[in-house]
Amino acid sequence: AGEDHGRGPYVQADLAYAYEHITHDYPEQTGTKKDKISTVSDYFRNVRTHSIHPRVSVGYDFGGWRIAADYARYRKWNDDKYSVDIKELENKNQNKRDLKTENQENGTFHAVSSLGLSAVYDFKLNDKFKPYIGARVAYGHVRHSIDSTKKTTKFLTSSYGGLNPTVYTEENTQNAHHQSNSIRRVGLGVIAGVGFDITPKLTLDTGYRYHYWGRLENTRFKTHEASLGVRYRF
């Protein structure tokens, strides 16, 4: 790939498809840590989602080994769940008492940024194709929050005298919980892919990377990414 054997600084731009796996661990309601972190819902325990995001890298090619610094931002994940349950408490003398419980839960998770440093080794099969493997360490910033509201309503339905039933509200209660965290951690990952030299200076890159962002308080976050990009060596 030229008289310098492929050595020199380079820049790379990628478009990545990320599969994101978020595991949020809540303590048991009867456990010793039940008051430290609220048990909100199983719905937020194990989230699998995906996003498409750009990534930019700046590095140096030593003619076999490459080192690079990269930066990426991910899409914010958010979802909500609403459930309602009505339980009959009493039914006698044409009077029926029910308890209505409503749960509204909203969760967001945002990998705000990932700043990484990678070391990659290129296998030169021929003048065009170069498979590669590598390792990556990254400083990640993550924000996640959960809002939960539980509302209970006790009401009486009276059908006395055979007339149209009349509903009376007897009691209302509402409990709200909010949890928000912004965490920064150093995580580790692996990289693999194939580069195809379009010209001595321009390379088409298809890659895969796995990254474990670390244990973010009571949240574990892992990403699998497939990317397509171009690398230009100066």
Curated annotation (Swiss-Prot):
The regions listed as transmembrane in this protein's record are none
Annotated signal sequence is 1
Top-rank taxon, per record? Bacteria
Q: Where is it located? A: Cell outer membrane
Q: Does the keyword Transmembrane apply?
A: yes
Q: Which GO terms describe its molecular function?
A: porin activity
Q: What is its main location?
A: membrane
**SUPFAM superfamilies according to UniProt:** OMPA-like
For this UniProt record, give its keywords in alphabetical order, as a comma-separated list: Cell outer membrane, Membrane, Signal, Transmembrane, Transmembrane beta strand
InterPro entries listed in its UniProt record: OMP/PagP_b-brl, Porin_opacity
Q: Which Gene3D superfamilies match?
A: 2.40.160.20
Keyword 4Fe-4S included in the entry's annotation: no
**Gene Ontology cellular-component annotations:** cell outer membrane
Q: What does this protein do?
A: Implicated in a number of adherence functions. OPA proteins are implicated in pathogenesis and are subject to phase variation.
Task: Provide the family line.
Answer: Belongs to the opacity porin family.
The entry's protein name is: Opacity protein opA56
Q: Which organism is it from?
A: Neisseria gonorrhoeae
Q: Which gene encodes it?
A: opaF
